């Protein structure tokens, strides 16, 4: 099911009406700037929500002062307030990131042109973040669990849902990215690596980056074919692999995928969320013997540090892949064609 995040219950329409108008104008200018540099609407919406929390805190606790007059002591007090109210370290880092991004905008854009921001310098980076601590039990899937889910969905003729699960399993993309695949991303001319992978056209991903996304063809094809046959038989025409119900000119909505996640959780009896399949995909590639550096390229990470976060294979199991019968053995290492 969609995982629950503790929310900061601080904003309200009444409080928003009383927030310092200069701060609200600053926020609007910042969001306009983000649109001008083509940040995604999801990213902009996140900044909007987070900054509303920040400005409401300033209203309640800091005398509704101008944003540019915040001190390091103010930021420490805000961080402590978040900790005291039970926010996760990841959530605190996100809120501080919103403050940091707005501060950078003030420093790089406004400090030269606006007298109110003359000589402004960002101070957020001087405040140490709380250590990252997991707040949820991570769902680690065995092959047979997810294959059982695919079998059940196929048996129920839920071909679109099965195709979605298979794409997440064998492509490892984030939930928002899974919405953005098109039918044309899975045609013969998109097959690469000796027939082992589909390589999509560039898709908008986190951080406003466009990446070519890879999917394991042999594993994914049965569920893709079932869904495309169902679409053909039922007159479903859309460029999107998963079209929006009632408006096939648009891709499926996140709210629909969240509802599906509840269904998958009931079927599996475990907490099903799309991001757990990103871990599954990375772990499966590693388990198959694909070098870490190649996995990093497949996912599109800029750093190998992310691999360590997403690889759920026990350390001893990874080491054991290269040894057998009392000696080094690399014969078990597979290529893409073998996965």
Describe the role of every protein-language-model region.
Residues 180-222:
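Conserved tyrosine-mediated DNA breakage-rejoining catalytic core shared by Y-recombinases
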Residues 216-270:
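Active-site/catalytic core of tyrosine-dependent DNA strand-transfer enzymes
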Residues 1-14, 325-339:
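C-terminal secondary-structure termini that scaffold catalytic or DNA-interacting sites
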Residues 143-175:
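Basic, Lys/Arg- and aromatic-enriched nucleic-acid-binding interface segment
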Residues 109-112, 168-194, 293-294:
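Short, charged phosphate-coordinating catalytic segments
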Residues 299-325:
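Catalytic-site neighborhood detector that most strongly recognizes the C-terminal catalytic loop/helix
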Residues 28-136:
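N-terminal core-binding DNA-recognition domain of tyrosine recombinases/integrases
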Residues 237, 258-297, 301, 316:
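Short, basic (Lys/Arg/His-rich) helix/loop patches that form interaction surfaces
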């Amino acid at each position: 099911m969609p995982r629950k995040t503790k929310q900061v219950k601080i904003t309200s329409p009444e409080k928003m009406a009383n927030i310092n108008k200069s701060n609200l104008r600053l926020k609007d200018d910042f969001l306009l700037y983000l649109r001008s540099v083509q940040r995604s609407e999801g990213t902009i919406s996140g900044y909007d929500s987070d900054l509303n929390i920040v400005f409401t805190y300033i209203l309640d606790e800091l005398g509704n002062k101008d944003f540019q007059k915040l001190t390091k002591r103010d930021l420490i007090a805000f961080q402590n307030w978040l900790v005291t109210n039970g926010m996760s370290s990841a959530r605190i880092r996100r809120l501080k990131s919103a403050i940091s991004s707005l501060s950078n905008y003030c420093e790089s854009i406004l400090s030269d042109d606006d007298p109110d921001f003359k000589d402004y310098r960002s101070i957020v980076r001087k405040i140490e973040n709380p250590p990252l601590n997991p707040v949820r039990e991570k769902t680690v899937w065995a092959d047979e669990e997810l294959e059982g889910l695919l079998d059940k969905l196929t048996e129920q003729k839920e071909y679109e849902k099965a195709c979605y699960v298979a794409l997440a399993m064998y492509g490892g993309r984030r939930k928002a990215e899974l919405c953005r695949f098109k039918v044309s991303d899975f045609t013969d001319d998109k097959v690469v690596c000796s027939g082992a992978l589909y390589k999509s056209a560039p898709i908008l991903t986190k951080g406003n980056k466009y990446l070519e996304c890879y999917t394991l063809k042999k594993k994914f094809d049965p569920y893709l074919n079932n869904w495309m046959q169902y679409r053909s038989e039922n007159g479903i025409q859309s460029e999107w692999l998963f079209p929006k119900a009632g408006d096939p000119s648009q891709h499926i909505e996140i709210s629909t995928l969240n509802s599906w996640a509840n269904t998958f959780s009931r079927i599996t009896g475990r907490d099903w969320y799309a991001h757990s399949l990103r871990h599954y995909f990375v772990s499966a590639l590693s388990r198959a013997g694909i070098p870490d550096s190649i996995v990093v390229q497949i996912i599109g990470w800029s750093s190998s540090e992310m691999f360590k976060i997403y690889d759920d294979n026990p350390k001893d199991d990874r080491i054991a892949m290269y040894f057998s019968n009392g000696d080094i053995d690399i014969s078990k290492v597979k290529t893409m064609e073998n996965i």
